């Protein structure tokens, strides 16, 4: 279970950080109160997910009820976050950025994610 947690963290943290830097900061810069709210909510959800990862790392017994419960909470948080992104954040991106801007944003996201990966492991 700890090995799986390490893999989850190695995949999730670079994604979170790149998304915050490129997507959420981009959305937050537009003049749309609702889009800014969506961006702020996403950022807060990222912070909570990272805190849960740290909490799980500090539980010595990966077979304990605490580790199982924490893993379940993390899973539910990530699922909720993905649903919010699909219904709100990506709508905001589509509404406020041209196709060319979205392509550029994706390139910057992927580049940023690669920069974060070594530090997140």
Q: What are the roles of these predicted feature ranges?
A:
Residues 1-121:
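Small-residue-biased structural context
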